Each structure stands twice: as structure tokens, then as C-alpha cells.
Amino acid sequence: MAASSLLLLLLPWLVTALHSPPGCKIRITSKGLDLVKQEGLRFVEQELENITVSDLHGKEGQFHYNISQVKVLDLQLPFSNLHFQPQQHLVFNINNASISLRFRRQLLYWFFYDIGSINASADGVRIHTVLQLSKDETGRLKISNMTCNASIARMHAGFSGTLRKIYEFLSTFIITGMRYLLSQQICPALNHAGLVLLNSLLDTVPVRNYVDEHIGIDYSLLRDPTVSMDTLDLDFKGMFFYRGKENQELENHAVEPVIKETERMVYVAFSEYFFDSAMHSYFQAGVLAIELEGEKVSSTRSPRFAQAALCRQGPCGGGGEGRDAARPGGAGLCLQSREVLSRSSSHCWITTDSASSLQVPKDLEVLLRATFFGTIFMLNPAAVDAPLRLVLQVSAPPRCVIKPSGTSVSVSAFLNISLVPPGRPAVQLSSMAMETKLSAKVFLQGKALRVLLDLRRFRIYSKQSALESLALFSLQAPLKTLLQLTIMPIINERTKKGVQIPLPEGMDFTREVVTNHAGFLTVGADLHFSKGLREVIEKYRPAPTAPAHPTPQPEEPSVDPHQL
């Protein structure tokens, strides 16, 4: 009884563990499979043209014959079909194909010896292959098994020369043997093409890759692919991770994407979890902070440029001295005097260059000094001419909300305003909370998912009192303008680079259409091969290793009648 109760308690957890919702889902439809078939046929033709057939030799009474150097000249594959077969299979059929051959003949009859070439044709070739798809231990899509059956309905050869009648007499033995040998070589060639070469193509699909110096993306398959009569569905984890804690898992409580459409070649769906994990990872990396520092107020202004750094909370972005950020061994990258000063740690990063260094706009600086004029004199009158510093720090991981009406991102942050007297501790003037809502335009370009953000709502308020919040009302519009003109371009500079979608190399999206749903969005697109299968496979084919002992070259067929 106790065991049964324990099982009932564990059952919900077990069901959740067995069916973790995907953050990214890809559906390939029958239309997409038709395009794959066209490229696949070219690949199959190339593989069959390279098949090797063993020599055929024998004896019939006083006739000795030898058939060698069999070469495929041409293939005709007029009827082929590639379709889905539930539950995990792809079926590839070729019917009524023909294969043109040429081979070398040798014949000895008593003292008569003949040598030459023969053209032959195999007609009514039928090939039936079934590929089983599954995920391997690393979460990568693989062809795990393949069955193949090949048959040749008929084969004929044209003979000429003085011994033509003799060859026609022996044609039954020669043609029957050649048909058997040829049919036995078709399936091994296709098995190697599927289990070795096509799997090497699937190895180009990104599974766990680094996006930049801070985060990575996990595209491992959660389960084996689901195949219906018209579609193939792939469930990917679709989780970003902080590179400092690569094994940390972020629980997925988002709505599972559901793809119902079948009109386009391929559909890609992303849940809110996909975007939330990206922002959570950047938050963990400590890079969602920005610091702006103005010039010192004096009768003769310093000609130096303002510093600007986008870094984590620490010496560069967490309230330390502005010049401390330039010391060796610090934790960020800062712009000072139009130069980028490198730091030993990679936890801080900046997306602007020296030509676009950030600084507190003069109008905003004047407004801030006027707003906090009384506070400055009450706290430290001697610091009235000190440079002004603004530190904007995200206080919690941003959250993404996807609705049929659009996609938005909610961000909570705090803004610290302080004066930085040279050689003395900073004087904090105000610490205010900030809530913003960004609209997100998601689009697919090539094979990269890109996001363009725009500031929609903005609100600041004091963390100390409602009275101070009222006093900060005049700063609302200037600070919103600051975000729109200086900070949003920096963010979009990063998000427009995008992240790669898990597709093999050489395959791209075209004619993309994004559709929003409740809790997820889908991208419907067509497929395009920018590279052929053979080109990609040859690119990643491992270089052959030299054998320890020289491999003997195959011997040329004998021209000595006595060696027949």
C-alpha cells in the first residue's frame, strides 16, 4: 500500500520528466521532403555511378571467359519517391530505373583468343530503402538503421566482332552473373551513403554551440522524431545557458509550441522559454548593465571624452571609480579618450566602438544637476563640480510575453545617479527603480533568428518615497530619450546578429512568415539548398590516413590466354 501511494506521488513528476516541453520545435512537411528528394536523387546518382563490381570469370567446356573493369556509364532514374512512414521512418523508392555499363571481355576457345569491351544495360532496376531516424546519446538526429532491397528485372549486352556468335552463346552465363553482381553492389553503396555520408551531414547541425563569449545554446533533441504520413516533427530543448555554469538547467514552465500548419516546406516554433533562457543567461553573466559618466564642470573644461562601459556589476559597472575600470586586472571594457582598454576578465563587454562612445548628454546633465542641486549641497557641497555618473543595472532577468497581438519584453532595473569627485568616494544623489516594456520584432534571415527591440513603455519611481517619485517626474521624458537614442541601439546591435537555427549546412530558409500565438510563435518558410549534399559531405570528409604498409595496387586483367 505504501509503495502504491509513493508511486502515485511520483507519477506527475515522472510524466513531466518523460515529456519535457521543447523550447524550439521544427516541422518538415511533405513539400519540404519533395525538395530534399530532388537533391537526394542527385546524391544517389553520384553514389551509384561509383559502385564497383567484382570481376566475373568462368569456364564452359572449352570456353574460358573473363569479365573485368566494369564501369557505370549512365543512370536513368525516372520514377522515384521519398515519403514519410510512421513512426520514425523515411522511405525512398526507385522504380524502373536503368543503368548503362561497359566492361572488358576476354575469351579463350582452344587456340582462339579475343579481347575487347562490351556495352550492357540493366533495365527495370528497383530499389527500396527504409531509413530509421532517432536521436543519439548526445541529442543529435541520426540515421540509426537502414534496410535496402534491390533487384534488376532484365539485363542485355551487345556483342560484336568475329566471336560474336560465341559470346551470344555464353551470354546467358555472362549476363546472369553480371546482373547478380550488380544487384549485390547497389545496397552496400546506399547503406554507406546513408549511415556514413548522410550522418556526417547531420553532424553539421548545431547541437550545443557557443553564441558569444557569454552564453551558448543547447539544441539537443529531447526525444526521437515523430513521423506522420505528412510531417516530421523534431522537439529541441532550445535552451540558452551561461558559459560560466554550462550544466545549470533552467526549468521550462512555458506553453509547449503546437504546429498545425502544413502549407509551407518547414515550420519553426519558439516558446517564451526560448527567449527567457537567453535573457536569464545574459543576466547571470552580469552584462545587463551600462555606465555613463559626464565631464567635470569647471571654467576650463577638460578636453577628454566621457567614459562609457557596458559591463557587469563590479569595478566597471557597479559603482566603483570610473578610472578604476581602466586598471589592469579589472572586470570590464571601458572607453576612455577614444580607446578601448582591455581587461583580464571577459565578464564585461561593450558593443560600441571608440567613434561612438557613450556619455551623458549635456541637456540631461544640466537637468540632473538642477534637479538634485539641493541634495548636492546637503550631502557634499565640495563635490558640486565633480563628474556625474549614471549606472543602469537590470535587477531581475527580463521576461518575454508572446501574444497573438505581438511579442513584448518586460525589464526591471534600477538607476543610480551619483557624483564622482576625483580621489574621493562617490556621492550618491538618487537611486530610482525603472520599469520598461519593449516590443520585439522577431524575424528569420538565412538561417539566423534575429530580434529587433523598440522601447514602448517607460516608468521611473523612487525606492524611498512617493514624494521623491513625484519630484522625478520631470526626468521621465529625458531618460526615456536617453534609452531610445543611446542604449537601444547598443542592444539591437547585438540582437540583430541572431542565433543559428538547427539546420544542416548548405540548407537555408526563404520567404519566411512569422505568426504569433498564445505563448509561442511560429516561422513558416520554404527551403533552399545553397550547397549540394556532396559539396558539404566532401568538406567534412576526414582525410584518409596512410596505411602502415603500402596497399598493393589491383592487378590489370591478364592478356595471357594461359592465365585465364
Q: Model segments located where?
A:
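Well-ordered mid-protein domain cores that form the structural environment of catalytic cofactors
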Residues: N95, S100, Q106, Y113, ...
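Extended, low-charge, aliphatic-rich alpha-helical segments
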Residues: A2-R102, K142, I152-G318, R327, ...
